[in-house]
UniProtKB/Swiss-Prot annotation:
Enzyme class: ligase
Compositional bias per record (Polar residues), positions renumbered to this chain: 1-10
Organism: Dictyostelium discoideum
Biased composition (Basic and acidic residues): 627-639
Gene from which the chain derives: cysS
Location of the motif 'HIGH' region: 67-77
Location of this chain's protein in the cell: Cytoplasm
Annotated segments matching region Disordered: 1-20, 563-584, 627-660
Taxonomy of the source species: Eukaryota, Amoebozoa, Evosea, Eumycetozoa, Dictyostelia
Cofactor note text: Binds 1 zinc ion per subunit.
Protein name, entry field: Cysteine--tRNA ligase, cytoplasmic
């Protein structure tokens, strides 16, 4: 470190690490204050959301840190992008904001260069491949695309201009073809490390932020060890762009500052990203942008998603718990994964495990069954039935109104979807109690009340993105994706019905009732689920049909087949062991050890081993074990002989024997 280093940037010592530094002053935006509270990483707590409505109505700007595309997207990405997709939908579809949502793609970086060289392909081919895969994953997860997408490789001229301006403002310098941000000069006029003040001076984090191709070689070029690269001089084999400082490439942190500023300007309402990016990436973004604009606050609200643990551990390939989004979707549906994230607060650490996913799946089933029940009531009960409200209906309606108020307050409290969803679950439980009570008293549930509850829950689910497509206000339930014309929708169902009719007719003509039943079961278990229809047998002669998500039903079929496959394998293994045991019972005890010459060399008159293969006498402890095995064989062989004497065709089986 040079002698110009500021005390604010000295290496973090044990004493300094133990003292929590305060957050710098946050400037409350001018404008209309709302009831919405947001956990702002710039303050370390919840603050009211304020937006400037002059001339633009309820509009806001939002910049989201996108992925560095060098590998498959994993569950950590799902955690971040689903969480912020939910918040974006809430702010747009529930709170009524018009959002300009910009996300970047880092398509040139140290990690990309290293991976491309390892694979022997160009960095552009590698990044294009994984960018395509990323957006395929986002589509499968029902994550809305950004309004504008910024790729680093398409913004290099703007990045160069941005760096030039920072240099001219006195906060960056050129050194050996690279350009570095002057943290010492900046710290004299601004607050550096707004998001994580305690991480300022952490050499390890600072080095990680520079990238593995740069961190070590650049130390001697910097005025301070904590300065970071805005422009990197390219080494042989690295991509290059022209600049006033020679051929090179952008640094990691400057990319977001330049691209976000180009589209959203010098003051942005919301910036989002994962917690692991706070320092140095996001703190460096803030510093660069303030240095460029000469202002004190580039971002008004910085929001971060919490860490995702896998079975309580940090996800890594070395621990063999690295789970890609596609791998997760092989086991769970997109809706189940979103339900899982909704059940957790977006800004807190969470644990991904079979148990936690199991809870989300059970929660989903609760709502699925409720929607089926509500639809059946509305479908089968005419409005001509009594609709007078008794105290039971008044009480249930009160629960609906309370749930509406509570969900609203939870949403305003830092997007608390977890408690909002539990409130809806409680409303469903109360509604189910009411429906059962009606059945017991032989009265009909009041249709408009059931419809109002189901439609309200559906509306909140559409806000959270749990419905795969826009669900009309008159619709209830999760809905389904891809609503085409009637012919497109009915064709696969009519094909299945036609095939079913042909098979039943053929079996009926052949008077094969067993085949007819098998065809009916196949329709229920194999054909209709793939069309999004589930049939539940209520009795030997009646059944109830339900519309359900195709992927959910498909996975249920797969899970059922896996269970049956395991049962069959266990059965075969058990039969195999019984058969082996039975075959062994045919051997007289005197011959049990005789052929084991690889273990023993001498035997007594009963066939018991007396010496091992080396000619050493068997020890007493070994002899005791062999005697026990010998006695057991005597018992099994006697049972075998007894079975021969009582049967002339095949041995009578005992609990210790098996058929041949």
């Amino acid at each position: 470190m040079s002698e110009n280093s500021s005390p604010k940037l000295e290496s973090t010592s044990a004493a300094a690490a133990s003292t929590k530094k305060p957050f710098p002053e946050w400037i409350k935006p001018k404008g209309k204050e709302t009831e919405l509270l947001i956990n702002n990483s710039l303050t370390g707590g919840k603050v009211p959301f304020v937006f400037n409505e002059s001339g633009k109505g309820r509009s806001l700007t939002w910049y989201a840190c996108g992925p560095t595309v060098y590998d498959a997207s994993h569950m950590g990405h799902a955690r971040t992008y689903i969480s912020f997709d939910i918040i974006r939908r809430i702010m747009k579809n529930y709170l009524g904001f018009n959002i300009q949502y910009v996300m970047n793609i880092t398509d040139i970086d140290d990690k990309i260069i290293i991976r491309a060289n390892e694979n022997g392909i160009s960095h552009s081919d590698l990044s294009k491949k994984w960018e395509t895969a990323f957006f395929e994953d986002m589509k499968l997860l029902n994550v809305l695309p950004p309004d504008a997408l910024t790729r680093v490789t398409e913004y290099v001229p703007q990045i160069v201009e941005y760096v030039e301006k920072i240099i001219s403002n006195g906060f960056a310098y050129e050194s050996n073809g690279s350009v570095y941000f002057d943290t010492v000069a900046f710290s004299k006029a601004h607050d550096y490390g707004k998001l994580e003040p305690n991480s300022v001076g952490n050499e390890k984090l600072a080095a990680e932020g520079e990238g593995s191709l740069t961190a070590t070689s650049a130390v001697s070029e910097k005025r301070s060890g904590f300065d970071f690269a805005l422009w990197k001089k390219s080494k042989p084999g690295e991509p290059v762009w022209n600049s006033p400082w020679g051929e090179g490439r952008p640094g990691w942190h400057i990319e977001c500052s330049a691209m976000a500023s180009d589209l959203l300007g010098g003051n942005i309402d919301i910036h989002s990203g994962g917690s692991d990016l706070k320092f140095p990436h996001h703190d460096n973004e803030l510093a660069q942008s303030e240095a460029f604009y000469g202002n004190r606050q580039w971002i008004n609200y910085f929001v971060h998603s919490g860490h995702l643990l896998i079975d309580g551990l940090k996800m890594s390939k070395s621990l063999k718990n690295f789970i890609t989004i596609k791998q997760a979707l092989e086991k769970y549906t997109s809706r189940q994964m979103r339900m899982f994230f909704i059940l957790h607060k977006y800004d807190k650490a969470m644990n991904y495990s079979p148990e936690s996913m199991g809870y989300a799946i059970e929660m989903e089933k609760t709502f699925v069954e409720f929607f089926h029940t509500a639809k059946q009531i509305l479908r089968d009960s005419p409005l001509s039935l009594p609709q007078f409200w008794t105290q039971a209906e008044k009480d249930l309606n009160k629960h609906l109104q309370n749930a509406n108020d509570q969900v609203h307050q939870f949403i305003l409290d830092n997007f608390n979807t977890s408690d909002a969803l539990k409130t809806l679950s409680d409303l469903v439980n109360k509604t189910n109690v009411y429906i059962r009570s009606c059945a017991e008293q032989k009265t009909n549930p009041r249709l408009n009340l059931i419809s109002a509850i189901a439609e309200y829950i559906t509306y909140i689910f559409s806000v959270f993105g749990l419905t795969e497509s826009s669900t009309a206000s008159s619709m209830i339930g999760f809905g389904s994706a891809g609503k085409g014309n009637i012919e497109e929708e009915m064709t696969p169902i009519l094909n299945a019905l036609t095939q079913f009719r042909s098979e039943v007719r053929a079996s009926a003509i052949a008077k094969d009732t067993t085949s007819i039943l098998k065809t009916c079961d196949n329709l229920r278990d194999e054909v209709l689920p793939l069309l999004g229809v589930k049939i539940d047998d209520k009795s030997a002669t009646t059944a109830m049909w339900k519309f359900e998500d195709k992927e959910t039903l498909k996975k249920e079929i797969e899970q059922k087949k896996e269970i049956e496959k395991k049962k069959q394998a266990d059965k075969e293994e058990k039969e195999k062991k019984l058969k082996e045991k039975f075959e062994k019972s045919k051997i007289p005890p005197q011959q049990l050890f005789i052929n084991e010459t690889d273990k023993y060399s001498k035997f007594n008159e009963l066939g018991m081993p007396t010496h091992d293969k080396e000619g050493v006498e068997i020890t007493k402890s070994q002899l005791k074990k062999l005697q026990k095995e010998y006695d057991n064989q005597t018992k099994e062989h006697n049972n075998y002989l007894k079975s021969l004497s009582t049967s002339t065709s095949s041995p009578t089986l005992t609990s210790t024997q098996s058929p041949q």
